[in-house]
Amino acid sequence: MRNHDCPTVRFFKARVYKEKETQMTQTKKAKVRNLIIAAMLTALGILIPMMMPVKLIIGPASFTLAAHVPVMAAMFFSPLMTAFVALGTTLGFMISIPVPTIWLRALMHLPVMTVGAYVLKKYPEFVHQKVKIQIFNFILGIFHAGLETLVVYAFYSLGFANIEQGALLNFLLLIALGGLVHSMIDFNLALGLGNVLSKAFPIDIFDKAKNLVNKKKVKAEI
């Protein structure tokens, strides 16, 4: 004998199906949105080194204001987007500045910023905690500047270019200290930009942080 669902069961099945369909549509829209944002940030990452007027070049070292902002902004979306934009910004430096050590330094954004994006994904609440986000910023800056210093040291130590020992030491100190300050300034620019834009547009890490804050408020009220 064939079983027929009662109207109530059919209603709930239709409702569940509609909710699943809505979730799938939202997921597809989010993927398309993130792809567009990744492309825009990558374009900015290429243009900033080429067009930014605030740029300091000392020998083989280069410090361009806001050069890290696109890849750091991508950290507030996902590790995958961060990696994609990091490669794009490296291309930007390769096009605009014909200095191999600068290319290598730019390439170091790939591991450092991607790991940073994973940390923010795990602890999204950091973006609303002023002390913790600056501690994160400082640690990120240390690894960022440290890895860039290490790769430049390896470049000269392996004989790809010649430089006097004293000049090399000064150069490495410049990259380490200047890179740390540069990284922290650019991260705060990216954080401020993300904080403002999150009020008008969905940004993954800021949305997760907001949800966590709301859950804590509900628990506190209970």
From Swiss-Prot:
It is a multi-pass membrane protein. GO terms for cellular component: plasma membrane. It is found in: Cell membrane. Disulfide bonds: none annotated. Keywords: Cell membrane, Membrane, Transmembrane, Transmembrane helix, Transport. The chain crosses the membrane at residues 34-54, 72-94, 101-120, 135-155, 167-187. GO terms for molecular function: ATPase-coupled transmembrane transporter activity. It comes from the Bacteria. Its main location: membrane. Belongs to the vitamin uptake transporter (VUT/ECF) (TC 2.A.88) family. Probably a niacin-binding protein that interacts with the energy-coupling factor (ECF) ABC-transporter complex. Unlike classic ABC transporters this ECF transporter provides the energy necessary to transport a number of different substrates. The substrates themselves are bound by transmembrane, not extracytoplasmic soluble proteins. Uptake of niacin into proteosomes containing EcfA1A2T and Niax has been demonstrated. Uptake requires hydrolyzable Mg-ATP and is substrate-specific; NiaX-containing proteosomes did not transport riboflavin. In L.lactis forms a stable complex with EcfA, EcfA' and EcfT. In E.coli forms a stable energy-coupling factor (ECF) transporter complex composed of 2 membrane-embedded substrate-binding proteins (S component), 2 ATP-binding proteins (A and A' components) and 2 transmembrane proteins (T component), probably with a stoichiometry of 2:1:1:2. May be able to interact with more than 1 S component at a time. This is Niacin transporter NiaX. It comes from Lactococcus lactis subsp. cremoris (strain MG1363).
